[in-house]
Amino acid sequence: MSGLVLEGMAGLEYLDCLSLPLDTLDLSECPRLREAYIGGARLTTLDLRGNPSLERLFCTDCGLRSLDVSGCSALTALNCSGNRLSSLTVGRLPALEALNCSFNDLASL
């Protein structure tokens, strides 16, 4: 499996994709998604547009170079450690309580 498209899955609330060999993951427009656990993949793309209910995102050791969570306004916990991120777009996340972005190539937030 190289790609997984879950775009528009209106009822999806929880996703566990740990250790799946994915290159792309499309989670756009999943309005009820609250938790997503993705790890050990070799992602080039992670699309999170249109996920206002996402509270917890763990995308560790995926090889991501960029990540945009600016549209995830309910996010309380984000762990994106162990990637190759040079760009992390967080925007305004008023509920964010925990952020782990260690072991990346970030110059600034």
Regions found by a protein language model. Name each.
Residues 1, 8-23, 27-43, 50-64, ...:
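Concave beta-strand-loop units of leucine-rich repeat
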